């Protein structure tokens, strides 16, 4: 996330490290200077601090992000709040554009109307700033954060910026007191997996027009509570937890995650799974960490998946555009589409930085423990977005910053 519309780094030429692997510090002071994810050049992640004096934190900061989260080292805090939004489930009209060699951002036209609710954790109100998704040079390693050294193909970031116009200041839960002052940003990180089943056929152009306007043929993904009829995604579906045919229902007779569910509350291996935390498929696998109370269930984010797929395929986003020449694509979405169901929003939290220059160290990270799945087509479409004048796509260098070696304290909302 960044507050700037950066230039393209190739506009000013490309520099290479000398024989000793050192890049000369430039006298530039611009905070919107261009940067790259190409690790072989001086504009790449290892040398971002040499591009501009505004980027100095990228090299000497003490709380740089992203990090590798070691789950058993994270400290449990009992009073950490649940992650909610105000107003709940509001659909926003956003605009997404080609961001050159960076992750395309979905920016709300009226973001001040949506706030993240983390009472007892943050001071003041934080309004929605953008949603974007990071990818890697390889299909398997695209998330910026990792947990116990494990990455996912993508990572979604929901960025919230402190609203100085409001004066609501709840009591703050102290996270160790290592860093003074308040944070300018709250960024919610969500690990995105990819799959093939349950996402339907590839939408055509006509269907994409309706999808991007917020019209979905299946409106049960975030339906009417735990006990409705035929909920698509358990908690938020119409038939949710006790649905007879709930897709992810905890006790759904025919649910994919029902009695013998992949990560269901009554999954075969629950609390004491044979393989503990790192079951057959890792923290969110068949033998998940805690089965019921603090376990995970991978949500199939069908609506988000189709929105992202259609947006990344659209010429306004896919084709390379210089700053000032980009065309915005209107997209209707709900930020909660990118999150696990409410009862599975267990998270890690720490005080870190933006993961793009200027690497500002004023971010409270809220990294979701439970993963969300989107169609494999989303990953393919994102990797085909053009980031360079010659048509080179985001597939070549990705849009992820390598994990940083800071010693920051990580807390968690679950045992």
Curated annotation (Swiss-Prot):
Task: Supply the source organism for this entry.
Answer: Pinctada fucata
Subcellular location, record wording: Secreted, Extracellular space, Extracellular matrix
Residue positions with a glycan: 27
Any miscellaneous information on file?
A: Two hypotheses for calcium binding are proposed. Either the Gly-Xaa-Asn repeat domain bind calcium or sulfite and sialic acid provide the necessary negative charge in the N-glycan to promote calcium uptake.
Q: Which residues bind Zn(2+)?
A: 132, 134, 157
Question: Reaction catalysed?
Answer: hydrogencarbonate + H(+) = CO2 + H2O
- Tissue specificity remark: Expressed in the mantle.
EC number of this enzyme: 4.2.1.1
GO CC annotations? cytoplasm; extracellular region
sequence repeats sit at 225-227, 228-230, 231-233, 234-236, 237-239, 240-242, 243-245, 246-248, 249-251, 252-254, 255-257, 258-260, 261-263, 264-266, 267-269, 270-272, 273-275, 276-278, 279-281, 282-284, 285-286, 288-290
Regarding protein family, the annotation reads: Belongs to the alpha-carbonic anhydrase family.
Compositional bias (Basic and acidic residues) at which positions?
207-219
Keyword list (alphabetical) reads: Calcium, Disulfide bond, Extracellular matrix, Glycoprotein, Lyase, Metal-binding, Repeat, Secreted, Zinc
Q: Where is this region: Disordered?
A: 201-297
> Mind telling me what this protein is named?
Nacrein-like protein F
Q: Where is the Alpha-carbonic anhydrase domain?
A: 33-414
- Per the UniProt entry, the disulfide pairs are none
Per its UniProt record, the required cofactor names are: Zn(2+)
Q: How does this protein assemble? A: Homooligomer; disulfide-linked. May also be disulfide-linked to insoluble organic matrix.
Record region (22 X 3 AA approximate tandem repeats of G-X-N): 225-290
Gene3D superfamilies the UniProt entry points to: Alpha carbonic anhydrase
Query: What is this protein's function?
Result: Acts as a negative regulator for calcification in the shells of mollusks. May function both as a calcium concentrator and as a carbonic anhydrase required for production of carbonate ions, which are assembled to CaCO(3) at mineralization sites. Is important for shell formation in both the calcitic prismatic layer and the aragonitic nacreous layer. Shows inhibitory activity of crystal formation when present in free state but, when attached to the insoluble matrix, may regulate the form and size of aragonite crystal.
In what ranges is there compositional bias, type Low complexity?
Answer: 220-289
Binding locations of substrate:
355-356
Q: One GO molecular-function annotation for this sequence?
A: zinc ion binding
